[in-house]
Amino acid sequence: MRSSVALAAEARSRFAAESHVPIDSIKIALSLAAYGASLPLPHEFDGFYPPPYGPQAYVHPSADPAAPPNRNAFRADERAQEAQAEAALTAFHLERLRAYAADAQTWRSIDALAFETVPLAREVRAIRRAVAALEDDGLKPEERKPWWVCAVYTGGEFPEQQQGGAGAASGGRLAARDVLAAYFGDSDVHGEGGARYAVPDAFGVNCTAVAHVAKAVAAVSDALEETGAAAQPWLVLKPNGGQTYDMDTRKWGWYGGESPSQGDEWAGQLGDIVRAATNKGVWGGILVGGCCKTGDGELRALAKVLDSNGPTGEIN
């Protein structure tokens, strides 16, 4: 795991030397995936986690037609199990953080922590607890890193289902205000006490088709405005190039009526989202880039669009 950071640091040094740019201007963000990405069949897009990380293991409908519907949210009468799931996810993320922090050179090479493609509110809370626990391990103030959590918005909606009654989870999806509460709320939703929740520097959306990002950002921006919070978090946007990942075939493709778009079109759409979010006035700044199936063409086009919009800044 730590060798990837060493490779990134070496690439940074070589690029700085060859391009004659200050090495301090090149930042390394450690990308850490959701628990669902570690499963044999990845579930970071839908959040169907097996116990103790979730309510039940995923069962493909064709494998067992009689199986109960798959769900990623606990019922209202399963609060104890939900608390256990959050604790298990905290342990998962903390173990990985400690693996990097244990080596001083590795940790010095990292400039920011990017938790990405996170589909569940309880996993966001778990990540906050893991970062807090790492800080409590004895990190000096100068050793702490800016960090953020990027959610995935499959089809334009946050994947987590709303909690239902004793029978099943509700068919609706978690509202934007509830997602924000998982990111920035200061209370222990389980009422256990003792757990500390670090506050991320930014809210993000990644691994989502750019066509769906506008809806997600608008909803979250409105919810953030409604809170009236004085602090302004940053916004991180890393949409896909447009293709969708099929979890059954494990392949990327153009599904659901989507069609290939050129880099200029992709960058133009993302630029419009950045302008709208900036004009909303609730974000401290915007960090923008690309995720899956974006390449040099998209990023060059994006750079031109952002240059015409003016700088968005950086997290500091």
Spans of features found by a protein language model:
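Domain-level signal for soluble alpha/beta catalytic cores
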Residues: M1-N316
